[in-house]
Amino acid sequence: MQTNLSQLIKVARGETEADLVLLNARVINVFNAEIEQANVAVFDGKIAGVGDYRHGKEVIDLKGAYLLPGLINGHTHVESSMLDIAQYARAVVSHGTLALITDLHEISNVCGKEGIDYVLDASADLPLSIFLQVPSCVPATHLETAGAEINSQDVADLLRLPNVTGLGEMMNFPGVLFGVPSVLDKIIAAAGKVLDGHAPGLSGKDLNAYISAGIHSDHECIHLAEAKEKLARGMYIMIREGSSEKNLAELLPLVTDQTYKRCLFVVDDRSCADLKSDGDIDAVVRKAIRLGLDPVRAIQLASINTAEYFHLQGHGAIAPGYLANMIVCQNLEQLDIDMVFHKGKLVAEKGQALFKPQSRIPKSLLNSIHIRPFDTKDLILKTIQPQIPVIEVIPGQIVTRRLDLKIPAENGVIKANTELDLLKIVVMERHHQSGNMGHGLIRGFGLKKGAIASSVAHDSHNVVAVGTNDADLYTAIKELERINGGIALAVDGQVTASVSLPVAGLLSTKPLEEVVTELEEINNQVAKLGCKLSAPFATLSFMALPVIPELRLTDLGLVDVKTFKLIPQET
């Protein structure tokens, strides 16, 4: 160790040759927001110096290309890609993401700590630094049934692991506000660490109370005024642009010379199709630049700001002593990535990963769909109420609206009405064979025929299905049982397409390209049935999440998120 440090110092002083020298670079300096003409010397995976360096075991002339720090995704759920961690790395490293922060609450809601162990173990040899925010909400709330639990003692144990930065998004904001002991115990266990928030729409004294508990950030802002209030009260604002959650255009005016250090870019949830076609955090940077943000400022929000918020020493900049995680591109505004270096090693070029990761998936994670036997009669929606609460989807957002509509019933039975775009939605418990099943109506999917189903249903990941009739709902759900989890489409009693996600019912075992092709096929079929949503299965996956306003459906029933209570259903 001392020998390497001594050699690093000698390389920095120009007394001995570097492992790698990058000549004639236009270096993006994230500390002073300037672009510097310089050479960069690398030794033992670190940057030795920026300046006049010419002697190295390997020398690459960049001929005036831009050299950027590796990008950092400050908040993402890798499971939303539907890829196992090895294939996920292939997808994002080629787009310049060399570090990320995730809380893995998707897979841990199904498999507990075993799911976390799988991701951390499988990522150990990848050219991608994964930092963990310990899941704070497994289960997310008492209003649904999860497959596992991570309690305050588990949180304390996980916080001692390497590469753990703090406590993941505290979604149970009512639990914070009402002082629920089990919630507060987790916050206390993470004292001194970074505590991420999740507080959609919270303001005034409730916001003060939430922040006073020690929570530092929020990524759920959808309106500029909301983001301004939270920033003014001391929060870091994670500006999100994912596959279903698109908040960048609305929130970008928040970034000024006075506020930019309190802002960072995140994707939260991004599909493998979007990762392949558009990219990861680089896509957010490109869009921010198109919307008028200065390119260097945009890079700061995807590198040094994130590193400093999470206290990631050695990440986020091209400077002496920092990790040699670097990106080469010709056009800063287009961010067309030519080369990606991880610790000084070329790991991707022209959009192609140069490494071949090996998947290491425990067999115990491959059997997670446990549904009590059911038939179409169990899917019937009955009511004697004059008005029915209906979930309304908002395109491009994961928040929903509550509609209370008069729906005609036949002998107390409510059926879907495709002319009014009123479809049936069902959530079925799939971890313990309890038989729990929630029923409701939803508007916004636009299906004219058939049904879609998914075992990806944030955050407890029970089975969620939307359809025009009970027979197709039944067929789609039974297909999920057959393939050990995934997504499915059924029309006229037949399965017309499905994508198997056997790892915890969330992730595929197939290569990136195959998964993307399968997803494109099923999405195209859904579109032909009348659905106008750009990402129907991504949207479907959030309909059972009872911590995002206004109305949700879990296996226990309809949830009014404003009151954080189940809505009684009189039948």
Curated annotation (Swiss-Prot):
Source taxon at top rank: Bacteria
NCBIfam families, per the entry: ade (TIGR01178)
Similarity comment: family membership: Belongs to the metallo-dependent hydrolases superfamily. Adenine deaminase family.
Record lineage: Bacteria, Bacillati, Chloroflexota, Dehalococcoidia, Dehalococcoidales
One GO BP annotation of this record: adenine catabolic process
EC identifiers of the protein: 3.5.4.2
Gene Ontology MF terms: adenine deaminase activity
Name assigned to this protein: Adenine deaminase
Catalytic activity: adenine + H2O + H(+) = hypoxanthine + NH4(+)
Cofactor(s) the record lists: Mn(2+)
Gene: ade
Keywords: Hydrolase, Manganese
Pfam families linked: Adenine_deam_C, Amidohydro_1
InterPro entries: Adenine_deam (IPR006679), Adenine_deam_C (IPR026912), Amidohydro-rel (IPR006680), Metal-dep_hydrolase_composite (IPR011059), Metal_Hydrolase (IPR032466)
SUPFAM superfamilies, A to Z: Composite domain of metallo-dependent hydrolases (SSF51338), Metallo-dependent hydrolases (SSF51556)
